């Protein structure tokens, strides 16, 4: 367990909340949908995501329900531990415990809350959950080329696997994405072996 990070489990033993030094990542609920809608309506929040501009509340609701019902998907809301303010969202997809998972979407919505280490703490919490709790061997993510979050991913030890050309469509425009990954031995070497 990383210092300052804790898991909280439900009666079935599943992790429903992760605490970091400054944040709580908790399973998303229907009460979060209006925040997701507001955040994902903001062009700055969705700049580097394949989220269509001007999506309706109904579309956000349908996506939430679909992902909540999908056993290969886990959705977290990122909350300031001190103030209780909702800060952002993290979504896992393609989860096959013991093998692989994708960080499908992660963001801190309000630009005034960026640059405070919240993204790093959120990523570390997810990495710990993925490798130590879910027992995954592979974690991967992709991002639009030019996304400034690439610096964070590099600093955490992710490896560049290549560019997927014209892989995502947003508002009718095709975008290249860069594929990054981390394997369990790499995570262990960086975060569990005293380094």
Regions found by a protein language model. Give the residues of each.
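Conserved beta-strand-loop-alpha-helix junction that forms the acyl-donor binding cleft
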Residues: 140-150, 167-170
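Conserved acetyl-CoA-binding loop of GNAT-fold acetyltransferases
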Residues: 154-164
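Conserved GNAT acetyl-CoA-binding A-motif
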Residues: 132-142
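A short, well-structured alpha-helix characteristic of acyl/acetyltransferase catalytic modules
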Residues: 1-62, 186-195
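Conserved acetyl-CoA-binding loop-helix of GNAT-fold acetyltransferases
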Residues: 108, 115-129, 150-155
């Amino acid at each position: 367990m990383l210092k300052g990070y804790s898991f909280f489990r439900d009666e079935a033993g599943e992790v429903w909340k992760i605490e970091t030094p400054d944040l709580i990542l908790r399973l998303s609920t229907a009460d979060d949908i209006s925040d997701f809608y507001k955040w994902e309506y903001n062009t700055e929040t969705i700049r580097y995501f394949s989220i269509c501009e001007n999506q309706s509340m109904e579309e956000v609701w349908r996506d939430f329900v679909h992902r909540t019902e999908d056993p290969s998907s886990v959705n977290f809301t990122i909350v300031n531990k001190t103030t209780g303010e909702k800060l952002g969202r993290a979504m896992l997809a393609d989860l096959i415990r013991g093998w692989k998972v994708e960080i499908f979407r992660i963001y801190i919505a309000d630009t005034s809350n960026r640059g405070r280490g919240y993204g790093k703490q959120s990523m570390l919490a997810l990495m710990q959950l993925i490798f130590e709790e879910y027992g995954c061997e592979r974690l991967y993510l992709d991002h639009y080329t030019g996304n400034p979050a690439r610096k964070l991913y590099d600093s955490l030890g992710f490896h560049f696997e290549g560019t997927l050309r014209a892989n995502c469509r947003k508002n009718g425009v095709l975008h290249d994405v860069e594929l990054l990954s981390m394997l369990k031995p790499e995570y262990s070497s960086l975060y569990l072996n005293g380094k």
